[in-house]
Amino acid sequence: MNLHEYQGKQLFAEYGLPVSKGFAVDTPEEAAEACEKIGGSEWVVKAQVHAGGRGKAGGVKLVKSKEDAKAFAANWLGKRLVTYQTDANGQPVSKILVESCTDIAKELYLGAVVDRSSRRIVFMASTEGGVDIEKVAHETPEKILKATIDPLVGAQPYQGRELAFQLGLEGDQVKQFTHIFVGLAKLFQDYDLALLEVNPLVIKADGNLHCLDAKINIDSNAMYRQPKLRAMHDPSQDDPREAHAQKWELNYVALEGNIGCMVNGAGLAMGTMDIVNLHGGQPANFLDVGGGATKERVTEAFKIILSDDNVKAVLVNIFGGIVRCDMIAEGIIGAVKEVGVKIPVVVRLEGNNAELGAKVLADSGLNIIAATSLTDAAQQVVKAAEGK
């Protein structure tokens, strides 16, 4: 689950980290009032969506009057913001963050993720702030500085000082950076985060450090023990198909291809997507129905896949272990009838009751293509998607 920038900054402020004075508003009139409350002669207004690249898309603007802030809010509230990180439909804007203007001297980067290889929280820092950090890591990896956090003792001040010196900070800036570093580490652990970024972390004209942005992603597996963060969830930012899948305990991720995939098991699902790619196809989704798939869940999975207008064919790849292939076959037949599937469906069944499942499909009289192997399934579904 992601948080909006204004929500992330609220958490930063609770941990004593330096953030701009600002207000999240949902009407143009409130935007003008926020400028009055903040004071000054210049403000930054930002459309709040769960995506980066807002500035280039016109979703961030420096304004010099309350009227301009009001006009910006009127222009964006209720609209959809399309950036390089969203799909073609963009994300709906229901909040505008109005905050004080910051005089920037230099931009840095500071972030943290859970590193699976070391099984530790790893902090990353760079002098290349304000830009796409993935691009920096790819083109100039030597500019990415790292600090690994020991889970037994947590982040230590000396680690913050080491990073500060490597970033070229000096004097009181080292103390400020260490305070921010330790505070972010505590925030990361307290709230079960999966990713945290301050991009940019800026050095202001007066030499002080300031958190100018906040990006927070929470580990969904830990949401049951984070009621405060659950209350911050903005469902308008969710993909409706992914939200539908979550209700049925289906693991679904929308992609940009035209071949729908329904598989039981995450590993098999990834392998299925790979072999579809290998044979020239493009998966439209990742969908794992899980080991305890039921007829109802298979039906809902079909509904989710077919809600994507780009899907031209569906590949169902089931390995029967816990789940019986004949039951899956009945679910497929029920779903095809209930949903009214008009596109080709290729099915590969292996394992528990696979032969019985194949017979159930054959006796159904429906236009379902049976595959003899995974390779055959991939080849058949790619041909079907191409209309061959």
From Swiss-Prot:
Q: What is its EC number?
A: 6.2.1.5
The record's Gene Ontology biological-process terms are: succinyl-CoA metabolic process; tricarboxylic acid cycle
Record keywords, A-Z: ATP-binding, Ligase, Magnesium, Metal-binding, Nucleotide-binding, Tricarboxylic acid cycle
The record's free-text note on cofactor binding? Binds 1 Mg(2+) ion per subunit.
Q: Superkingdom of this entry's organism?
A: Bacteria
Catalytic reaction equation(s): succinate + ATP + CoA = succinyl-CoA + ADP + phosphate; GTP + succinate + CoA = succinyl-CoA + GDP + phosphate
Please report which protein family the annotation says this sequence is part of: Belongs to the succinate/malate CoA ligase beta subunit family.
* Name of the protein in question: Succinate--CoA ligase [ADP-forming] subunit beta
Q: Which organism is it from?
A: Ectopseudomonas mendocina (strain ymp) (Pseudomonas mendocina)
**Gene behind the chain:** sucC
